[in-house]
Structures are given as structure tokens and as C-alpha cells.
Amino acid sequence: DRLLDEPSNLHLAISPHAQAGQPLWVAACDKAWLKAAIAPLEAAGRPVSRIVPEFTPSEGVDPVMPTLHALGDSTQAWLVRSNTQGVLALPLQAAAVQALANDASWQQASFFAEPAAVASAEAIVGRQPQVQQATQRWVQSSQTAWDFAQFDLANSGRQRSAKKLGDAWRKLVHAPQWRPAR
């Protein structure tokens, strides 16, 4: 609805399943930060063809049922909640989490935590999370259709074609029928 920064300072990306006339998600992040993260890869001759967000709004049919992720460690941990209504990151502290805990879906939500955040997450949230390494979460993120490489970060036509082939290959390789071969 409103941007908290100047549009020229932000990189914007549209959700992958956007349809004309329908509500859609627009992701926003600091353009300078994103370009600085990409620059070393491109300087090393590794052009970036896809930029995947770590967390996205859920695409499930239940708009209320969230997924919770505890990140970080016991000294600096975060709780990330995602559902079809968006993504929210809060410090993993009792006061910050209290408003979410009153939600009826809280106890039924899928709950994951990085190994270093398990103890503090369990103590504050009041239930045991499933342990999930950050790398596991990143692999799951890479399997979504989201891509921030849009607009001024989109590559040439040849690179876009290669990207489409790569996307098709990734879908094929991650298809359930190929699981025994992996």
C-alpha cells in the first residue's frame, strides 16, 4: 500500500502467480544492498539468473494457518511467521511473541527452529519445534516459483531462456517420481 522508503532506493518484485485484476504480493528490499550482494558473484564470472527470497507468503488454501520459523541463536533469535496474509519477523522474545500467541491457529502451526534457536524457541513459544537447518530451508525456498531477478535485475533474453530451461530442469529433477533416483 505504502512504501517506507524512496522508490528509487528499492528493488520491487511481483509474486510469481500474479494475475491482472487480482490482489498480488509485491516484495520490496533495499536495492543497493541487493546489488552489493550480487556484485561479487558477477565479478567472479557467475551471473545471477535467479534471486530467491528465504520466506514468502504461503500459497495454501488456509489463509490463517501460519508456518513459524525460529532463527538465530540464544543471544539473537527471530521468529518468522508466514501465511497467505504475508510474512512477519519479530525478535524471539516473550513480549514480542505474545500478540501472536493469542491467535487460535498458533498451537496448530507448523513450527521449525534452527538448532541454535531450539531451546529459546521452545521456552518462549511453549511447544517443541521441529529442528531444521538453514540449508534445508534454503533448498525449500529454491523450489518455489518466486524470483526477485525482475525489472532492472532481469538479465538478457539469452540468459532468460537459459533460466527457463534451468527452471524446467529443476522441476523435473525435484518431481516426486525421481525421488528414488536422488
Range-by-range predicted roles:
Residues 1-182:
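Hydrophobic/aromatic-enriched cytosolic interaction surfaces used to assemble or bind macromolecules
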